[in-house]
């Protein structure tokens, strides 16, 4: 699976994403993910439909992202998690998710439901992520309106019961990069 091919990168620059996806298909990837979450809904739908059509023409699956998964870096590091969770700021909108799934025909949808993306920036990369939780009712509602498997990005640091409840309500794939990367980097540092 080729994950997080952005349409707009972290520096807010457009990415020529199709050649990246084409190389992945030639290399034998069985699924790809296009991240148009920094685009307007209409643009994200158009880009994702293009990528889903391309993926399906090559007999592979397409994952997409809708909503804004909070980050543990940059501006996200200074945000009040409890306030974001309470107001659902950036959470995937139910109406938009229904429209997105229907119009794009993506196979999986990465949704914003309370998780926190990993610590990548230099200033926070060795810090433990704040403990997050998932809005299980929102996950169930998203699963119902989209009718497709949901994906959880930022799965590191969420307690096991929340993960199990998320799976029971529609989460089918979970990304857990922070715990793996931090363990790898710590071990690498110990061997040098």
Task: Kindly give the residue locations of the regions a language model identified.
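Alpha/beta enzyme core
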Residues: 7-148, 160-176, 182-183, 187
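Extended, intrinsically disordered, low-complexity segments
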Residues: 191-192
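Short catalytic/ligand-gating loop segments at beta-alpha or beta-beta junctions
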Residues: 153-156
């Amino acid at each position: 699976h080729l994950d997080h091919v952005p349409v707009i990168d972290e520096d807010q620059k457009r990415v020529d994403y199709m050649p990246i996806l084409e190389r992945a298909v030639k290399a034998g990837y069985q699924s790809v993910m296009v991240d148009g979450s920094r685009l307007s809904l209409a643009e994200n739908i158009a880009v994702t439909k293009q990528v889903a059509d391309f993926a399906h023409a090559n007999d592979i699956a397409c994952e997409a992202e809708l909503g804004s998964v909070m980050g543990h870096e940059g501006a996200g590091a200074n945000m009040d998690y409890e306030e974001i969770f309470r107001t659902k700021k950036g959470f995937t909108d139910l109406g938009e998710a229904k429209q997105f799934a229907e119009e794009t025909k993506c196979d999986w949808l990465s949704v914003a439901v309370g998780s926190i993306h990993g610590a990548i920036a230099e200033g926070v990369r060795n810090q433990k992520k704040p403990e997050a939780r998932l809005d299980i009712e929102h996950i169930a509602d998203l699963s119902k309106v989209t009718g497709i498997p949901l994906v959880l990005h930022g799965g590191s640091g969420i307690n096991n019961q929340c993960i199990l409840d998320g799976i029971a309500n529609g989460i089918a794939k979970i990304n857990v990069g922070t715990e793996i990367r931090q363990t790898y980097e710590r071990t690498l540092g110990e061997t040098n």
